[in-house]
Amino acid sequence: MTQKEKDLLLRDLCARLPYKPIMQIGNCGACNLRGIDHDNSAELRDRAIVWNGQYYPSSTISFPMIDCKPYLFPLSNMTEEQLFEVQEILGKNEIEIGDGFLHIIDSCRNTITYLEILALLEWFYKNHFDINNLIPMGLAIDATGLNIY
């Protein structure tokens, strides 16, 4: 993992902390992310796990960021209901969302305020969508069909 990738993952996970993202740790099971330490290690909880041959009971455990991957949904998997929620946040009649773009169709209002942008980002983080393209980079796991959230 390059420093640039590590920084991107760290920024993404910090924004997701209030929404309890589920993480894959190495080849262990899924755990809830509790916090990120100043040394860029992830703190996990809610599950006893085995890591590097050692057993850790259910408690707070720190792991290097390189071993942690969040479970996220690609934007292309957004349902019609979710798209409607995004339209309500932006106050737009019709929008189209793809991986990496937001296209506003048929709208008489051509501006988006920074408060709408912040609300939209919060919605994406809360619903565990991959808005930073971590999945194609191998920094996150596609949660489609896993029924993990």
Segments from the language model and where they lie:
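Structural boundary micro-motifs
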Residues: M1-Y149
